[in-house]
Amino acid sequence: MSIHLVIIDALNLIRRVHSAQPDPTDIARTITTTQRTLTRILSEAKPTHIIAVFDHHEQDRGWRAEILPDYKQNRKPMPEPLMQGLDAIQQAWWEQGIDSLLSEGDEADDLVATLATKVASHGEKVTIVSTDKGYCQLLSPTLQIRDYFQHRWLDEPFIEKEFGVKPSQLADYWGLTGISSSQVPGVPGIGPKAAKEILTQFEDIEAAYASDELAPKYRKKLDEHIESARLCKRVAALKCDIELGFNLQDIRFTGPNKAE
């Protein structure tokens, strides 16, 4: 039997649904709306296995903040009513047949990346449901990213149009340009156009840095800021070796569960 694993980036979905509600304290409405969303996802994707991955403590910025203290420093805190309603949301999703994985000390992104690449590496189909373009570095013939809200696939043609590089070069791209929304600085003076030019000529940051053929206008910047580039690439890259503590059988989709 062929496998199709769907991984829901839970807070990515929930926060977008919640922010569109007229009354931010009406968590019941948020629950109902997310359930309708999940019903459509289930209908479209027809998964054999499914799981929703949550950042357990969103205010804990994880290991990336330990090596880059400003990382996501300006992230808006989750609204208190929504924070208080997460358990109820997880219960409602469980009743739909979707279990939750809570990150403990690891960023949810790394858990998603580990699970997705592990399954895809065996030739099985994986769909990550998220608007987060950071997942696009994982793209492979059997691993796809679905932006549910824009009704689009974040695929290789999208990455080429958006960034001008290959999915496998995205961490290097962000190492050079930085990620302003997450307070990742990158290399001063290197923006998207320059990063695209560098990564069209060279496979990655290290190849560019080691080459005598790097354009002089970029050589000075890399010479001065190579450690920042390396650090920012490390922060932008997803970990794919997190201990998961469960197997696929545990997240097989068998339909709705009975409410406890």
From Swiss-Prot:
Binding residue positions for K(+): L176, P185, V187, I190
A Pfam short name: 5_3_exonuc
Keywords recorded for this protein, A-Z: DNA-binding, Endonuclease, Hydrolase, Magnesium, Metal-binding, Nuclease, Potassium
Superkingdom of the source species: Bacteria
Cofactor(s) needed by this chain: Mg(2+); K(+)
Binding site for Mg(2+): D109
Role according to the record: Has flap endonuclease activity. During DNA replication, flap endonucleases cleave the 5'-overhanging flap structure that is generated by displacement synthesis when DNA polymerase encounters the 5'-end of a downstream Okazaki fragment.
Protein name per Swiss-Prot or TrEMBL: Flap endonuclease Xni
Phylogenetic lineage: Bacteria, Pseudomonadati, Pseudomonadota, Gammaproteobacteria, Vibrionales
Chain's gene name: xni
